[in-house]
Regions:
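Zn2+-dependent metallopeptidase catalytic domains
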Residues: 1-155
């Protein structure tokens, strides 16, 4: 049986879900996302929606959808086995998103796209996505700087 957490063709396959699917799916999706991020980071072509934002949106959507199913099932169908697997994977997911939110190269690429002439040709929804990402990066990076400063002050 295929892993239902890796099936994005329709509605979630909750009936096929088993706790042992979680780590396999999350590991595969994180590996996919990290490979994509490395490709996006190393791409020296001018930044566009198609070569930068869209691939990231697609990859993060798959990870978010799979983890969302796990979180939902942990809330409504909690069992000792699922709780253990959920708790094992939560730090890995958290670490990935923390790294993503503090990635200066990705932040620079969003800034380049915002300054690019293509930005004015994008739909208002896509412009809003880019602007929201820039705001999020600024906030997350500022929060990180405050933590670093507080740690330095505490020494």
């Amino acid at each position: 049986m295929s892993n239902p957490l890796l099936d994005f063709s329709g509605l979630p396959r909750f009936a096929d879900f088993q706790a042992e699917h979680v780590t396999t799916a999350i590991d595969a999706l994180l590996k996919e996302n990290r490979a994509l991020l490395e490709q996006v980071r190393s791409d020296r072509q001018p930044v566009t929606w198609q070569n930068f934002v869209q691939p990231m949106v697609d990859a993060n959507e798959r990870l978010s959808r799979a983890w969302g199913q796990v979180s939902h099932l942990n809330a409504v169908m909690n069992s000792p086995q699922l709780r253990e697997i959920y708790n094992e994977n939560l730090p890995v997911i958290t670490q990935f998103y923390a790294e993503l939110s503090q990635d200066l190269l990705l932040f620079e690429k969003f800034k380049q796209l915002r300054a690019n002439a293509e930005f004015d040709q994008l739909t208002s929804a896509r412009q809003k996505i880019i602007d929201n990402e820039l705001k999020r990066y600024k906030k997350d990076l500022a929060d990180q700087m405050r933590i670093v400063e507080a740690d330095a002050f505490d020494r």
